[in-house]
Every structure is written in C-alpha cells, then in structure tokens.
From Swiss-Prot:
The lineage of its organism: Eukaryota, Metazoa, Chordata, Craniata, Vertebrata. Disulfide bond formation at Cys-242 occurs in case of membrane damage that cause the entry of the oxidized milieu of the extracellular space, resulting in homooligomerization. The keyword Ribosomal protein does not apply. Changing residue 169 to E: Reduced cell viability upon peroxide and saponin treatment. One of its GO terms (molecular function) is ubiquitin protein ligase activity. This is Tripartite motif-containing protein 72. Homodimer. Homooligomer; disulfide-linked. Oligomerizes on the phospholipid membrane. Interacts with DYSF and CAV3. Changing residue 180 to E: Reduced cell viability upon peroxide and saponin treatment.
Amino acid sequence: MSAAPGLLHQELSCPLCLQLFDAPVTAECGHSFCRACLGRVAGEPAADGTVLCPCCQAPTRPQALSTNLQLARLVEGLAQVPQGHCEEHLDPLSIYCEQDRALVCGVCASLGSHRGHRLLPAAEAHARLKTQLPQQKLQLQEACMRKEKSVAVLEHQLVEVEETVRQFRGAVGEQLGKMRVFLAALEGSLDREAERVRGEAGVALRRELGSLNSYLEQLRQMEKVLEEVADKPQTEFLMKYCLVTSRLQKILAESPPPARLDIQLPIISDDFKFQVWRKMFRALMPALEELTFDPSSAHPSLVVSSSGRRVECSEQKAPPAGEDPRQFDKAVAVVAHQQLSEGEHYWEVDVGDKPRWALGVIAAEAPRRGRLHAVPSQGLWLLGLREGKILEAHVEAKEPRALRSPERRPTRIGLYLSFGDGVLSFYDASDADALVPLFAFHERLPRPVYPFFDVCWHDKGKNAQPLLLVGPEGAEA
C-alpha cells in the first residue's frame, strides 16, 4: 500500500511556513526547513557560532547546513500533481479521515489504507472543524501572552544582571582604589621613615667612625713611641718610660665606648600586617555622619547641649514625660535627628569611662513609650556596656549575649551600617588610626532607622558621664 494521500504533502512541508519546501536544507540534528525560513527564525548565531534548531533546540552550525536535493526533487514532483487531488490516484480529495486527520480520495477511502477509518465528507468536515478555530486561536493567544510575559521577565532579569554587575564592578573598583591609595600612602610614609632612620643612623655612625679612627691613630702612634723607647739606652729609657706609660694609660682611659645604635623601625610580622589591616579598615569607612541628638525624643532627665552633640543624664528630679509618642518616657535614651534609609553610614560616639551605655539603631516604627525590650524583633539592634567591663550584644534572647571582654575598655565606639549588605557593625574606635571589630548584626534592617543612644540612669553620679557625638573636627568637649 502506498502512503496515505496528504501525508506525503505533510512530510514535504516546512514545519515553519507549513508550505512545500523551497530550497530545503537539513540541520545537523536531521530536521529540514526552507533555507529562508530557517534564516528568519534562527536569528543571529550564539557566541560559539551556532544557531538553535526551531524544532528540537539542538545547536547546529550554519556552515554545516546541507541542501537536501532529494527533498527538492520530491517537492518538484509533488508540485506537478493538480492541487486538491490524490498524489497516488489523481482523484479529487473529497473525503476527510478523522483518524489520520487527512484529506483522501474515494479510492483511498474504500480500498486503500484508510478503509475502515472514521470518514466524513470534506464539506461536513470543513464546517465542523471551522467551528473549532476560535478556541484554537484563543489557546494560541493565551500561549503567546504567557511567553510574552516570560520574555518580559527574562529581559528584566537581563537588565538587572547588567545593573548588578555594573554596581559590583563599581564597588570593587571604588574599594580596591581606596585600598591602593591607602597602601601607597602607607608605603610612602614607611619609606620616608626608613629614609629618616637611615639618614640619622648614617650621621651617627659616621661620627662614631671618625672618632674611632682618630683614637685608633693615637694608639698606633703610641705603639711606635713604645718601640722607639725600647731601643733607648738605660738612662734615657728610664727617663722616658714613665712619661710614655703615663700618657698611654691616659689614652686607654679615654677609650670611647662601643657604638650602640637603636634603630626604631616596625617589625614586619603577622602583628604588623594585622595593624595595617586595622588602619586600612578605618580608611575604607565612609565619611563620618554629622549627627545631632533630637531633644524632642529625649527622656525628660536627659540634657542635650545647644550644639546637639552632647547628652547627659541630670541628677535633678526630672519632670514627667509629655504625651509625644516620639519621646522616651521610661528608657533614658535619645535618637538622632537624622533618619537613615539607604546606602552606607558610619558614625562615632565618645563613651569615655562611662560604665553603662547602649548604642545602635531603632526602627522608625518601633515604640518608644514604656519599658523597651531591646531585641531585633522589637526594632532595636544594640551593643552595650554594663558594670564598666562587660560588653553585651542585645540579640534575640532572654538576656543579652555577653561578649569576650576586650583587652581595654573602649572609650569611643564606631558604628557602620550598610543597607545593601544588611550589616550593622560595632568597632572600638579609641585609636584614631585603627578600628577593632567588636560585634555585628547580619540581617536586613527595616527602613528607615534612627541612630539610638541609651545614656542609662546616672546611678547617683556613678554613671553621670555624657555621650558625645564625634564630628569631622572631633568630639565636643
């Protein structure tokens, strides 16, 4: 039996334009297309020079496309069959086979391969199938909409990737640039110090060398005198011996002490590298925020200076708190005027020898009335000192987490906040040239937040020391 009528036409049709092949080419995966159709659909080659097969998505090289002469000859032969007639029997295609979804002639339907199939007159099949087109069109439109959304999402993600990479490269370049500037300045400073030491040591050593050479010359002269005296007659020998030996003893007594030069240069060790890292850490911090305390938020017992950069707890009886929800009525605390909501920020607070305090940030929506529960879930991220020696982080727990006691109690605290990285870090900033990490919260903070300062109760004068905000010119006295 020959192939079913219509199936040959289907097999010789391009899967892209659904028409008979025109200049058919075959890809490496085995699928065939009109050359023009493939060029239109495949688009520009990828980085490796390949295009994707529209049927199976397999990569194929455009230069490997081969003209399919056998297909071309079959198409040419099929084109000679009158349109609407069976390729095998040349009879009109008047019957529709539902089972094979193909038009067939009467001979194929009654005697050929479609005998016994579900068959309909072509006119009836046309009317029935035409009613199904709107539903199929709707399905096609819905599929297009879904794919268009997918395309939009991918295009947006592509833009996001480009922007993320651009920002990453910018941040890397900026930070590494700062590191290079810092290290170049440090290298220059150390080189100048080494040159200074070399110069001073050279002058001192040359001075010592001149003195020693002069003394050595005296010793050699005395050696010659002794040799001359040894050859003298008895009387002259005895007369000169006492003079010569007396002079020799005087010269020996004036012997210059051995040179002792103390060269003061840093020892290049792991500790040196650690010190450089700490100094570089400070150099990479953003510029100091110029914060001021917000008096309207301060507990009634707190006194804020006219400059807004000094706050202390008064030992005088405080008036009752007002009704302003922005004011702390139980916690002896205050926030900064400035709210922070994006980017990087760094500020410093002089705590001096104050034995109790807490610093950090508070969410703008966090309550300020009543007793504060100082944990992140309540909008507070704090580091504090108690009893003058115990640093503690106010983490999500019943009690604050006590940290390892530092070698020395910090007198100045540095706080670094990065919304992009989701980090709030605390540092011992007592050394003007270096920062020592103390603790860090790693989480995405709500926006905005306010710098928070818990001055704590004065404790009958034991904790009366102020908190001072540090500006570019230093802390207020």
